[in-house]
């Protein structure tokens, strides 16, 4: 799983190069030598806020942009961690959690992993498993991300969304040294209109199904003792 998650973030590399090119173009000297009037600072700030709001709305409405955005943010977290304090795992995991929280529906994923056991679990057990599941996945994710080596990732398909569509698979290809690995994010649209990641499949391995089977096996092995299954989940399942 670590190998799978470490490759997810590298899609940001190509985007970073494009951003650098755009920055270089923006820095070219203007031929207009006439002094320009200074803009009102409040208007500049207002304009920036409006632009940021529009970009945020676009990302929420477009699942493809959402996947790219979370990847770019993770790349920045990795760079910052490596350059400032590479031994502080607690701070790194906290930064990863901050990035993933708006994009990944951990509650939905935990619900699917528990399967039918969610119906017999108490509210406290469901809440505790969601927390344990999220924290364990983030730590595994974070350690995997630190091993990425700039593998090339391309968007394999970006078909137009149909009206009313609330589920889509964002497909990518991870180009390694000698092999191409297919990657697919399952994205679901919430009632708020926001697209969230609810599952990942890499090279034919469905993360959600794999973890659900592990939860089922652990519950059956331990006489359906959900408290034990939940408390030991981080060490056994991820």
Give the label of every model feature segment.
Residues 13-46:
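N-terminal propeptides/low-complexity segments immediately following signal peptides
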Residues 86-87, 154, 228-229:
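Short, hydrophobic secondary-structure boundary micro-motifs
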Residues 118, 135-136, 175-176, 203-207:
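Solvent-exposed loop/turn segments at secondary-structure junctions
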Residues 139-181, 232, 236-238:
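Surface-exposed, charged secondary-structure patches
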Residues 191, 199-238:
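Low-complexity, intrinsically disordered terminal/linker segments enriched in charged
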Residues 175-204:
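Extended hydrophobic
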Residues 1-16:
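Sec-dependent N-terminal signal peptides
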